[in-house]
A protein has these predicted regions:
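Hydrophobic h-region of N-terminal signal peptides that target proteins for export
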Residues: 12-21
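Edge/loop elements at the starts and ends of beta-strands within beta-rich repeat scaffolds
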Residues: 37-46, 80-82, 213-217
Length: 262
């Protein structure tokens, strides 16, 4: 056998080994993302109250506040049940916003107010309040929305985290790229997510906080969103009254919200 043969043989062996390692890494990344998703939201229809407050950098008192009543119909496929991802967002506070409703069906989003004749499509990236966009108040399933790659391990506060790179699977997804930090030990609790634009500019950072036992798992009941582009102003999303609730499917339709969802 000549040297050229050995060269080709080692090249093939290296390529095969690399492919196996990459597949193994991606499978591990997928499992981490899946476990973290289970912490962020249950795989059953549920309802919660979301209080959003807006702060200037360094401030301790909010300058703006909004309260939303949200029903989520998110389910991964199990047995004869198909996957579903819909939500109903009712505006509660301030009083001037009562009667306004947002409806999402996978990655489509509509807004309705009694002044409109019919629901109108809106962007998930459109600002709702402070650093919070329309899409932020609706739980995103990272496993379905992004391809994930495990980049390694890093320190996060006093703990060790997996660092994962997420790249959106479709242009329908709000954020093209996310760097996601998930605790290595325990249930793989989410720690932080950094959201990037198409040209790799860091837009905002999300910190998961105040973990409490809710619906069978320890879940983050507070999320702080910091706008790194505009002086580190930040907004806080606080979750309360989280409970399982399965509304009829027709509640998650444009026809229903036009009649005034309850």
């Amino acid at each position: 056998m000549n040297m050229a043969f050995y060269g080709r043989w080692f090249a093939c062996l290296w390529l095969a080994t690399s492919c196996v390692q990459t597949a193994s890494t991606d499978n591990k990344a997928l499992e981490i993302i899946r476990r973290a998703d289970e912490i962020r939201s249950p795989n059953k229809p549920f309802r919660y109250t979301l209080t959003v407050t807006e702060y200037k950098a360094g401030a301790t008192q909010p300058e703006n506040k909004q309260i939303l009543d949200i029903s989520m119909r998110f389910m991964k496929p199990q047995g004869n049940e198909k996957a579903d991802a819909r939500s109903l967002v009712r505006f509660i506070f301030p009083p001037r916003d009562k009667g306004k409703i947002m409806l999402s069906d996978w990655y489509d989003l509509w807004f309705y107010t009694p002044e409109l004749r019919r629901p109108m499509p809106i962007s998930r990236q459109q600002r709702l309040i402070g650093q919070i966009s329309n899409g932020d108040v609706i739980v995103t399933n990272f496993e379905y929305a992004y391809d994930s790659t495990l980049m390694g391990e890093v320190s996060c506060a006093e703990k060790q985290c997996y660092k994962l790179a997420l790249v959106r699977k479709s242009a329908d997804i709000t954020w093209p790229k996310v760097i996601y930090y998930v605790e290595k030990d325990g249930d793989n609790r989410p720690w932080k997510a950094a959201y990037y634009s198409q040209d790799d500019q860091l837009i905002k950072e999300v910190l998961y906080q105040d973990f409490q036992p809710v619906l069978g798992k320890t879940r983050p009941m507070k999320i702080t969103v910091t706008d790194v582009r505009h002086g580190n102003n930040y907004s806080v999303m606080e979750y309360s009254d989280v409970r399982l609730e399965s509304l009829p499917e027709f509640h998650f339709t444009k026809e229903y919200i036009q009649r005034g969802a309850k």
